[in-house]
Amino acid sequence: MTINEIRDKLKETGYIPTDDICYAVFGMLALNKPLLVEGAPGVGKTSLAKALAEVMGLPMLRLQMYDGLTKDEVLYDYDYQRQLLTLEAVKPKLNEEIKDLGINDAIKHVAGDVDFYGKEVLIPRPVLQTIDGSGRKLLLIDEIDKASEETEYMLYEYLEDYSIDIPQFGTVSCPEDQKPVVILTSNAYRELSGAMKRRCSYLYIKKKTRAEIIEVLKYRTSVDERVASGIASCMVAFQEMDLKHPVSVSEIVDWASYIEKDGSREGVQNSLGLLVKDRRDMEAVSATVRNYIHDIAY
């Protein structure tokens, strides 16, 4: 896709990209390179991944990161119950074959006779699912900054060349024509390692300007120019506030959609639950909405 095609197709999904976003997506696709997207909460990092999956017609796998994730949740796992059932099934035959062997020889014989680590017992987790030859996918690694450094290290091989080395099984490498689209998001909760950053191209999504918010509302809702301008003014004010839960672009779109249905002064003032997700923010958000109510309410 060209830069203009990326811009137009993202807009068709309702995602309004800046030039920075379009060029970052173009570079990611041209080089088959993971894209690390940073920005404040609510600026549209996750929405970009969803919109791009829709544009490209790819299934999206989402890996929500948090401290404590292990490789059997991120990369792969084994079906231990099936392994035990396999052992039980061949046990009578094995007992007969190893009855005259020493312990070391018996272990070697069992290990060579029963495939405990074959494809039949391997459970692919999100990362492995994107390179196992089952079709091209988009992988969203969401909030990578909340994962531990050990989890970061776990992903290096995958992000480098879309392959995973699995002990006792071998190396799984992605077919050339199925290389995944990989987007990592970060809220800068902690500094990512240099090794992680070197494996990715980079995009920082800025907070949206008033004009950009108005454009989003025009594409995503049917509110008129006056209401869109008033809502955009509110959003710009929200972005400058130190809220416990910053208001996201998707939340402001939901609020505008509500106002389409009930734009009365009372309706606007009683719909703040669409914006406020922490009771400590209610007073500040409510005061801001009151300042712009004459531009928003019908």
In which residue ranges do the predicted regions lie?
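C-terminal regulatory/interaction module of P-loop NTP-utilizing enzymes
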Residues: 1-298
